[in-house]
Amino acid sequence: MYKLEVQDLHKRYGSHEVLKGVSLAAKAGDVISIIGSSGSGKSTFLRCINLLEQPHAGKILLNGEELKLVPGRDGALKAADSRQLQRMRSRLSMVFQHFNLWSHMSALENVIEAPVHVLGVSKKEAIEKAEHYLAKVGVAHRKDAYPAHMSGGEQQRVAIARALAVEPEVMLFDEPTSALDPELVGEVLKVMQDLAQEGRTMVVVTHEMGFAREVSNQLVFLHKGLVEEHGCPKEVLANPQSDRLKQFLSGSLK
């Protein structure tokens, strides 16, 4: 059984179709990197998986359980069961490009927020878990700091700890290093590599070709809302079949 399965996902904005039937399947421990040019639909696809964006067609399954979707007035699909959506979202955590930490909360408070208020974990247990994950990503010493007083790399590592604190079955990363200064990228990629080596199931939208090649076991190249190529990262990157991917890599691959 797949941990995460997305079938024939479509999304449009007005008459512009951003996703034209994208499918993806991740087994336990898979690390899938999604690459592509700006505007290819990468981030939209990721955001549709947990309904931050509403798709217009397709199926989303987590551990074989299908997310129940019904058409809304605008034609987009919405959750038919809000409790199911909340439960599935807690098993499908997301790390955002711009961190999305609560500015009025400390690092520790950011990490315990969802376990306490969404999952109903006791505050004592949530704090113990938060301190564990903050230490795991190397920012235990910053637990009382507020986002404005942290570097971008520290904020993103706190965001990863926050995502881990709900004990997710699948982690989604939306260009987690693209908002960072170049010297801070490595510290975040190292945390992600460690998570991959632990056997975490991860779907990563990224421009970091080294990570895609060395850490992922699947690579997806999206172009204009369609999967142009999909396969073993080292093989796809070393021997691209499509002219579009060759052109993309000529400007991206270091």
Swiss-Prot record:
Keywords: Amino-acid transport, ATP-binding, Cell inner membrane, Cell membrane, Membrane, Nucleotide-binding, Transport
Cell membrane listed as a keyword: yes
Annotated localization: Cell inner membrane
Family annotation (PROSITE patterns): ABC_TRANSPORTER_1, ABC_TRANSPORTER_2
UniProt topology in membrane: Peripheral membrane protein
Binding residues annotated for ATP, in chain numbering: G36, S37, S38, G39, S40, G41, K42, S43
Pfam family, one: ABC_tran
UniProt xrefs under PANTHER family: AMINO ACID IMPORT ATP-BINDING PROTEIN, L-CYSTINE IMPORT ATP-BINDING PROTEIN TCYN
Family per similarity comment: Belongs to the ABC transporter superfamily.
Protein name as annotated: Arginine/ornithine transport ATP-binding protein AotP
Organism for this UniProt entry: Pseudomonas aeruginosa (strain ATCC 15692 / DSM 22644 / CIP 104116 / JCM 14847 / LMG 12228 / 1C / PRS 101 / PAO1)
Origin organism lineage: Bacteria, Pseudomonadati, Pseudomonadota, Gammaproteobacteria, Pseudomonadales
The encoding gene: aotP
